[in-house]
A protein has these predicted regions:
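Short acidic alpha-helix that forms the nucleotide-activated donor recognition element
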Residues: 14-17, 96, 115-116, 136-147, ...
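Conserved donor-binding/catalytic core segment of Leloir-type glycosyltransferases
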Residues: 68-86, 92-95, 106
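Nucleotide-activated donor-binding/catalytic signature segment of Leloir-type glycosyltransferases, i.e.
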Residues: 73, 100-109, 114-141
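Conserved donor-binding loops in enzymes that form glycosidic bonds
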Residues: 21, 48, 78-83, 110, ...
Length: 197
């Protein structure tokens, strides 16, 4: 461990132990950091939640057909941060292998890995991969409804490091979801709700 890591660990413990209370979003994060507390009673779980007034299957409005054209293709969608927490190589490989099928892939968002996706799209001629800017929040239920399946390819190093909060909005909109992350089921939702099989 480097001197920098040692110092940061000490700062982390100091913050935890000087605080009146600390919250985390699930059991995974709780179990990861609880041993760093002198008083574990300071650590509390407040789960992620969904605004069901916005995210529900009936809240659908027309989309810009220049961005989201009406076609009979199977549409797979990811919306959110395009970062290192996700593994984008399986997506690129999948788009390449299915380029002759009636399947389109939509990635909506920004992040440090967006340039990688755009580079792969250009180099490999992946015309059915659409990399789009963030869309207005009020349109997200409609965008989820536009697609047939949502997907999340988690990076292997993120195994069991919490649960993607976007899963809850997808579930609230009653859309199917494909999550890929090594050999393990994602997070603690399968254990709590009997899903993820």
């Amino acid at each position: 461990r480097s001197l920098q890591q040692t110092c940061l660990k000490k700062v982390e413990r100091c913050i935890y132990n000087k605080s009146a209370a600390i919250t985390t979003i699930d059991d995974v994060f709780y179990n990861t950091i609880v041993s760093r507390f002198e008083d574990p009673n300071k650590l509390h779980i407040i789960p992620n939640f969904v605004d069901t007034d916005l995210y529900n299957p009936t809240n659908v409005e027309p989309l810009d057909e220049n961005i989201f054209p009406k076609t009979d293709s199977l549409k797979l969608l990811y919306a959110g941060n395009i970062g290192h927490a996700q593994d984008w190589r399986p997506l690129v490989a999948l788009v390449e292998k299915t380029k002759d099928l009636n399947v389109e892939y939509f990635v909506v968002g920004m992040g440090v890995q967006r340039s990688y996706l755009e580079q792969q799209k250009a180099e490999k001629g992946l015309d059915k991969l659409h990399v789009l800017d963030y869309q207005p929040r009020h349109l997200m239920p409609s965008i989820l409804a536009y697609s047939d399946v949502q997907f999340i390819f988690m990076a292997p190093e993120m195994e069991m490091m919490g649960f993607p909060s976007k899963v809850y909005t997808i579930m609230a909109c009653e859309r199917p979801l494909l999550i890929c992350s090594g050999d393990k089921r994602r997070g603690n939702l399968p254990d709590c709700y009997g899903t993820g099989r």
